[in-house]
A protein has these predicted regions:
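Amphipathic beta-strand/beta-sheet edge segments enriched in Tyr/Trp
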Residues: 18, 27-28, 96-167
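Hydrophobic beta-strand positions that form the internal "hydrophobic ladder"
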Residues: 183, 224-227, 269-272, 313-317, ...
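A flexible loop/linker signature enriched in serine peptidases of the S9 family
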Residues: 176, 187-194, 211-213, 230-240, ...
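Short loop/turn segments that connect beta-strands within beta-propeller blades
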Residues: 140, 199-203, 244-248, 288-292, ...
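Short beta-strand->alpha-helix linker/helix-N-cap micro-motif
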Residues: 31-102, 115-121
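Bacterial N-terminal signal peptides
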Residues: 9-19
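Pro/Ala/Gly-rich low-complexity, hydrophilic intrinsically disordered segments
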Residues: 157-192
């Protein structure tokens, strides 16, 4: 069955298609993923606990919890190489706000950065204030180059650690870290599909919609304030809505009749690309988000959908079956210069353009008829398969630093959200609740 047939077949067939075609892949492309990239050796001396626990039951020491989150964030940054502090002779409880003589031994053992801190709770209830002081020693300068106090309630302890990690990344790369980013996704609730949001590491999942409809294919606005998504209010109408995260307010952006699907906002937020069958065939359209003027971008006998913007905003990748089976194509933002990108394999769909611009992830069907994630350069000269193993891998979305991809997979039976580095390493499952979690989309950096 062709992609066009599936799209035109209607509601039931299309819902089945959504879980298959919204996919992608990944590979090495950024400084931290290059074979010659040297991670910065970093030792976390510890977060000294000055009193209090993260939970009112007293089970988790505050300092230990912050240290655990910080270590995970630093590891996932792919900027630093964590060095075991055992044997280095440095302990957070013995450190002040100045370089310590014990750092000399650490530096002799290859450490470039030492991080430590202190944390305590002012009073005994769970809503009391937490003070966390974080320090950074840089061996190159032989000085403490960072010292900062973080203050908040016990409910934001993880956020404090995330912020500290992001500031470390920014200090040493000049780029925002990803520890405070969010991932929106779709979760099955009975016969409905509702939108959820969670921290990038899977913590603190929160439901965004609760209307009992099918709410699918969310995508972020560049300012992180909104999500655009397709909503199925009935069997014959699929609209594109805008959801304001801070207030929960919703607006309908596209209601042209027929299928209105796979929305994607441009990097500057000025345009919305989407697919619509309002004129009979699934074609790509572009809406000016200010004037609401709509321009049709494609006209052909095949079905066109799943647009993904290049970071420049000048091009889009999309899926089309105009050549037979689903393949990835490129098109200029004004509808000109359409060309086919993928030629290997009979099924390539759901492209996701990396924020660095030099890779496009997509779903590829292997010779063994497995749906996996692949990467291809925009010039088509290099292609790699990222994922292997059991299950259907689907719905890729890039981290804002371009070092990771989040996607859904049925590797464990049910569909859940996973994260993987762009070199294919460190595969991690990050959702553990819900019966079916899919269509993840990674927020821009804060």
């Amino acid at each position: 069955m062709t992609l066009r047939t599936l799209v035109i077949a209607g509601f039931c067939a299309f819902v089945g298609l959504v879980w298959i075609i919204e996919s992608g892949a990944a590979d090495v492309f950024l400084e931290a993923a290059r074979p010659d990239f040297q991670k910065i050796p970093l030792a976390i001396a510890g977060i000294e606990n000055l009193g209090g626990t993260e939970s009112p039951e007293g089970r988790v020491k505050l300092g230990s919890r912050i240290e655990e989150v910080l270590k995970t964030d630093v590891r996932r940054s792919l900027v630093f190489a964590l060095v075991d502090v055992n044997g280095l002779g440095i302990k957070a409880g013995q450190l002040g706000a100045e370089p310590d003589p014990s750092f000399k031994h650490a530096v002799e053992n290859g450490v470039s950065v030492v991080v430590w801190g202190r944390a305590g709770i002012k009073s005994g209830n769970k809503d009391s204030d937490v003070n966390m002081d974080g320090y950074v020693y840089d061996a190159g300068n032989n000085e403490v180059v960072g010292g900062k106090r973080y203050v908040g309630s016990t409910s934001v302890v993880r956020l404090m650690a995330h912020r500290f990690a992001d500031e470390l990344v920014f200090r040493y790369t000049g780029e925002p870290g990803i520890a405070r980013t969010k991932i929106a996704y779709v979760s099955e609730l009975g016969s409905a599909r509702e939108l959820f949001i969670m921290d990038y590491d899977g913590y603190d999942p929160r439901q965004l919609t609760a209307d009992g409809f099918l709410n699918l294919m969310p995508r972020w606005s560049p300012d992180r304030r909104f999500l655009v998504f397709t909503t199925y209010r009935n069997r014959n109408t699929q609209d594109i809505d805008l959801l304001e995260l801070a207030t929960g307010k919703r607006w309908t952006l596209v209601s042209q009749g027929g299928l209105n699907i796979t929305p994607a906002l441009s990097p500057d937020g000025n345009f919305l690309a989407y697919s619509s069958s309002s004129e009979g065939n699934a074609e790509l359209y572009r809406m000016d988000t200010h004037s609401k003027a709509v321009q049709r971008l494609t006209t052909n006998a095949g079905g066109d959908l799943s647009p993904s913007w290049a970071p420049s905003g000048r091009e889009l990748a999309f899926t089309s079956d105009r050549s037979g089976g689903p393949q990835v194509f490129l098109i200029s933002a004004d509808g000109s210069n359409v060309r086919r990108l993928t030629f290997e394999g009979d099924y390539n769909a759901a492209p996701a353009w990396s924020p660095r611009g030099n890779w496009i992830a997509y779903v590829c069907r292997t010779p063994r008829k497995e749906y996996k994630l692949c990467l291809i350069t925009p010039d088509g000269q290099k292609r790699v398969q990222l994922t292997t193993g059991p299950g259907v891998d689907d719905s890729p979305s890039w981290s804002p630093d371009g070092r990771h991809i989040v996607f859904s997979s049925t590797a464990d039976g049910k569909s859940h959200i996973y994260m993987i580095n762009t070199d294919g390493k460190d595969l991690e499952r990050i959702t553990f609740t819900g019966t079916h979690n899919s269509a993840p989309t990674w927020s821009p950096a804060s």
